[in-house]
Amino acid sequence: MWRPAKXPALRCVATDGHRLARIDAVLPEGANGMPGVIVPRKTVNELRNVLDDDEAQIAVSVSETRCALA
């Protein structure tokens, strides 16, 4: 996840080595100043399995060394 400095959006990008995908989403409240983080593919797949509802919301907490998703 990455927040471009000049755009008020949350940018998510992914690649499998051959293809590149990008999604821009509305920046949630309180996310200003959030650093860019790399989330491993296995973690993203586990989240997709747990969050089967398209409308489900998650909380993201980011520090210099960790990213917590709840």
From Swiss-Prot:
Gene Ontology MF terms in the entry: 3'-5' exonuclease activity; DNA binding; DNA-directed DNA polymerase activity
One of the GO BP terms on file: DNA strand elongation involved in DNA replication
Annotated keywords: Cytoplasm, DNA replication, DNA-binding, DNA-directed DNA polymerase, Nucleotidyltransferase, Transferase
Annotated Gene Ontology cellular component terms: cytoplasm; DNA polymerase III complex
Location of the protein in the cell: Cytoplasm
Residue ranges the record marks as coiled coil: none
Protein's job: Confers DNA tethering and processivity to DNA polymerases and other proteins. Acts as a clamp, forming a ring around DNA (a reaction catalyzed by the clamp-loading complex) which diffuses in an ATP-independent manner freely and bidirectionally along dsDNA. Initially characterized for its ability to contact the catalytic subunit of DNA polymerase III (Pol III), a complex, multichain enzyme responsible for most of the replicative synthesis in bacteria; Pol III exhibits 3'-5' exonuclease proofreading activity.
Family according to the record: Belongs to the beta sliding clamp family.
Quaternary structure, from the entry: Forms a ring-shaped head-to-tail homodimer around DNA which binds and tethers DNA polymerases and other proteins to the DNA. The DNA replisome complex has a single clamp-loading complex (3 tau and 1 each of delta, delta', psi and chi subunits) which binds 3 Pol III cores (1 core on the leading strand and 2 on the lagging strand) each with a beta sliding clamp dimer. Additional proteins in the replisome are other copies of gamma, psi and chi, Ssb, DNA helicase and RNA primase.
PANTHER family for the chain: BETA SLIDING CLAMP, DNA POLYMERASE III SUBUNIT BETA
Name of this chain's protein: Beta sliding clamp
Organism: Rhodobacter capsulatus
Organism classification: Bacteria, Pseudomonadati, Pseudomonadota, Alphaproteobacteria, Rhodobacterales
Recorded name of the encoding gene: dnaN
